Amino acid sequence: MLNSINTNPGALLALQNLNSTNTELAATQGRINTGKKVANAKDNGAIWSMAKMQSATASSLNSVKDSLQRGQSTIDVALAAGDTITDLLTKMKEKALAASDTSLNTASFNALKADFESLRDQLQKAATNAKFNGVSLADGSTTKLSFLANEDGSNFTVTAQTLSLTGIGLTATSTFTDAATAKTMIATITTSLQTATNKLSSLGTSSVGLDTHLTFVGKLQDSLDAGVGNLVDADLAKESAKLQSLQTKQQLGVQALSIANQTPQTILSLFKG
């Protein structure tokens, strides 16, 4: 190799190698500090863009889950009201059956009639109050409710099941006035009870479907989050090992540069003396 005091090829090469090591070391330290192998678009534009889109989809599913959970609660309230209503109908049937006994005296009959009418009014209140966040599937105020099903805005629709008096074949004045009408009311209440249980069965089916879809959305979100992690997260164990290797390489590079920088002094020493 030609020795010169004007240029020092060895020092230039050592400096280039050291700069390269420092750049790689800074990148490795950045990955360790952020935990990301792709922290921004300049790291890897295609991967960064893909990860951003997947992350946005996963984030938007939070709104879907919130909507579906509101749907769950709305159905649960309607089902709870339905349980109360079927219990009330059972008691109303008992009162009507007892009142159909022609051997009753007037006082006993009137007491049964009053109990029946009180149960009837309670039934209407149960249906009217079956609201979650001001929304009801049981009071007859709507025919269906739609909740978010996916991040594209598609819906999961639940058909309302009216459990108020009119929804199950009764009225606000349904009652009996004597043993004969009480006997007729037994059949009416039996039909109402069957109607109510059928409607509750439909709500139950909707509840199962909504729960299943909510579970799916949760799993989908977890999968998307994991996919984003696979795209951009750094392997910290690997990066830590690489960091130690680069730090050693950096130290050797500094020493190599120091040695190379001594070459001109060696040349000058040849002229001494």
From Swiss-Prot:
It is found in: Secreted; Bacterial flagellum. In C.crescentus, the flagellar filament is composed of multiple flagellins of 29 kDa; 27 kDa and 25 kDa. Its main location: secreted. One of its GO terms (cellular component) is extracellular region. Keywords: Bacterial flagellum, Secreted. Flagellin is the subunit protein which polymerizes to form the filaments of bacterial flagella. It comes from the Bacteria. This is Flagellin FljL. InterPro entries: Flagellin (IPR001492), Flagellin_C (IPR046358), Flagellin_N (IPR001029). GO terms for molecular function: structural molecule activity. The keyword Secreted applies.
